UniProtKB/Swiss-Prot annotation:
Signal peptide: none annotated. Component of SCF(ASK-cullin-F-box) E3 ubiquitin ligase complexes, which may mediate the ubiquitination and subsequent proteasomal degradation of target proteins. Part of a SCF (ASK-cullin-F-box) protein ligase complex. Interacts with SKP1A/ASK1 and SPK1B/ASK2. The lineage of its organism: Eukaryota, Viridiplantae, Streptophyta, Embryophyta, Tracheophyta. InterPro entries: F-box-like_dom_sf, F-box_dom, FBS1-like. This is F-box protein SKIP27. It comes from Arabidopsis thaliana (Mouse-ear cress). GO terms for biological process: protein ubiquitination. Pathway: Protein modification; protein ubiquitination. Keywords: Nucleus, Ubl conjugation pathway.
Length: 225
């Protein structure tokens, strides 16, 4: 019985508190008045039990409301609502395009770095050394110095080609004219060419039929004696 009575008492007390709050809110609304001022509509109230009165200015109008432990009641005029809606429409939306662009630039820079690092070796350098040496053997003798400065693999292949190919075959000669006067002199003297011999070129001897017969006769004499 004691527990039952205690439960009934708590229920009655809570219902009484709710009724008092309802009456206080209704009385506050009845006592509140609307006044039109130069700044707009102002809501005033004589009730002081909710807290101190404060005034809120929004655009064309100001609203006075109470702040405390109870609920807040704010009444906004139609003009203020229209001004708020217009300001909300006119507020520019800040787009997040700049950080996106910066991230895209970073990704592109990374891609270019990766592509440049992957394309450091050309197709010529990717060839095996035997084929690379054969390709370099078809180059002029004067271009070997510049090929040594390209890369390590081409430098090694050019050194091998120099020892194997260019030491036994004569490369192409290049015409050298010091100035335009030398060019005219050469053209006048029945196109005599002033050529530069390539360095370390082997000597070529011209064999005639008489020289070959002499060599063969000496060989035959040595055999039959």
């Amino acid at each position: 019985m004691i527990h039952y009575l205690h439960f009934i008492g708590e229920f009655c007390f809570s219902s009484a508190v709710k009724v008092v709050e309802w009456f206080s809110e209704n009385l506050f609304l009845k006592r509140s008045t609307m006044a039109l001022s130069k700044r707009g509509f102002v809501m005033t109230s004589n009730a002081r039990f909710h807290g101190e009165e404060e005034e809120l200015e929004l655009g064309l109008g100001s609203v006075r409301f109470t702040r405390g432990l109870g609920r807040k009641r704010i009444l906004i005029s139609s003009c203020v609502r229209e001004s708020l809606s217009r300001s909300a429409v006119e507020i520019p939306v800040v787009s997040e395009s700049p950080p996106v662009k910066s991230s895209l630039k970073r990704q592109r820079s990374r891609i270019t770095i990766v592509s440049s690092s992957s394309s450091e070796k050309s197709r010529l350098e990717c060839l095996p050394q035997d084929l690379l040496i054969r390709v370099i053997c078809g180059v002029d003798h004067e271009d070997l110095k510049s090929l040594k400065l390209v890369s390590k693999s081409i430098r090694e292949a050019s050194l091998v080609a120099k020892t194997l190919h260019f030491a036994y075959t004569t490369p192409k000669k290049t015409r050298a004219f010091r100035n335009s006067i030398d060019l005219e002199e050469v053209s006048d003297s029945r196109h005599q060419e002033d050529d530069i011999e390539p360095p370390n070129a082997p000597r070529h001897y011209r064999w005639t039929k008489a020289k070959r017969k002499e060599q063969l006769s000496s060989v035959s004499a040595a055999l039959f004696t």
